[in-house]
Amino acid sequence: MEYKLKAFCISALLILLQVNEIFAESGYELWLRYHLIEDVALKRYYQIKNSSIVFTARTQKQLVAKTELYNGLKGLLGFTIQETHDVKDNCLLVGNVESSPLITSLLCAKELDSLGDEGYIIRSLQIEQKKVTVVVAQKDQGLLYAIFHYLKLIQTHQSLDGVSVKEVPQIKYRVLNHWDNLDGTIERGYAGYSLWDWERLPFYRSQRCVDYARANASIGINGTVLNNVNANAKSLRTEWLIKAAGLADSFRPYGIRVFLTARFSAPQEIGNLDTSDPMNPKVKQWWRNKVTEIYEYIPDFGGFLIKANSEGQPGPQDYGRTHAEGANMIAEALQPYGGILFWRAFVYKNERYVDRVVTGYNEFKPLDGQFKENVFLQTKNGPIDFQPREPFHPLFGKMPNTALSLEFQITQENLGHAGHLVYLAPLFEETLQSDVYGDGKGNTVSKILQNYHETCGMSAIAGVSNVGTDLNWTGYLFGQANWHAFGRLAWNPDLTSEKVSEEWVRMTFSNREDVIDSIKRMMLISREAAVNYMID
């Protein structure tokens, strides 16, 4: 069996090396490779289907979307699309409800309302016997997502005849967690140093940070936590908030909101208080003042991520308070601004005779219903600590009155770092499709997350990032596939690993069937292979 696996991997890599266009590429473009289509007939087909465009861009995000579309089409088709104000045959109509009354009139109001802020429609229609393709959203953010999807259709050689796509994200907050330290190092990072050039911020605006935001937007990620969960209190000092605001300015055009981790003892460490007791009025006021200051610098600040009373981190239990009391105190400060709090449910102490597997469950289950409505309990996919295989965390299905956020680890802490090809979409899918049997059969983790979204509009999923300063972003090329897979499954938790992997291979390498089949197969068996050899 081992010999057959090695032989297959070698043959797959040989096929990969035959794909001429990957030579001399660094991997920097990720899955957004808008290279000229080589098939002459196919290229001509897409040129005809994009003969002209009606797209009036007025806002910053609309201009970003328009630039993305024009650059993508020019790269893929080798020409600049003709802009017009009149509808012509094979015209592309692009806009949102506010910017294009014409497009709005083509679709029913109920369907447009169902898109929300981030959903979109791509559809073939006829206007006065003229064939057109409509790309429409309610809001600018949805329009940007629609543009990326439209380019993906061409990039992956899909037919535009009779196209009908409607996409609405199933999870509201789709957030990367960066375990980046303020000195530029990354805990569990295997792809270089932090992308955030703190020493030169806020005045230096890195193109790489813009490209990072663009890549995230292309897969639907809409938030990023800048710093390590093992937090440094000085990240909340004014000079560091100004630096974070510089990053937020770079991310904002792509719809990426900035979050920060906060150290629970910050009132003592940087606020000159003698306590961080969440019931102390001075402590409460300190957090209110700090949050107000943050929103002055970052008006669309997302909120905080906090690790408390775990692995030596300070927390409310230091003062005899519960996790709910500690979380609610900070959540109250965030609430007037629409901010949210991710409170990690990964808690354990280095004590003998304590079953680490059940610690989180025992601490948080009794607190169900005691957390404020803008608090998420950020819960790892398994009860131990990002192992190659774990059952789903027992809190899922057992806290019906508390919003839980699912936390995956994209960086490969226990799966070979950046030295082993391990495709994580099967791991993500395994967790999401696990049946918790909380209310009978069919109550999967995915459904639990989506139910939060449907009932209270609060749903979230987080991924510990594998991104760094390496030119290929993730230390090795297939690490990009894990970043991509997280974004796609965060948008739609019911996608399959097979579908997501094929999409990534087509966008990153080639649309040749032999290349797709070989690389996809290698990816899909890699996680199971890693589990087997790491257990053995």
Question: Which residues make up each language-model segment?
Answer:
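A cross-domain feature marking catalytic cores of carbohydrate-active enzymes
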Residues: 178-180, 228, 260-264, 308, ...
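Active-site-proximal beta-alpha loop/turn segments in soluble metabolic enzymes
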Residues: 233, 268-277, 307-318, 346-355
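Bacterial N-terminal signal peptides that target proteins for export
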Residues: 1-9
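Acidic, contiguous N-terminal accessory segments
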Residues: 22-128, 161-162
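Feature activates predominantly on carbohydrate-active enzymes
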Residues: 58-68, 72, 109-288, 292-305, ...
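Structural motif
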Residues: 54-59, 93-99, 136-138, 180, ...
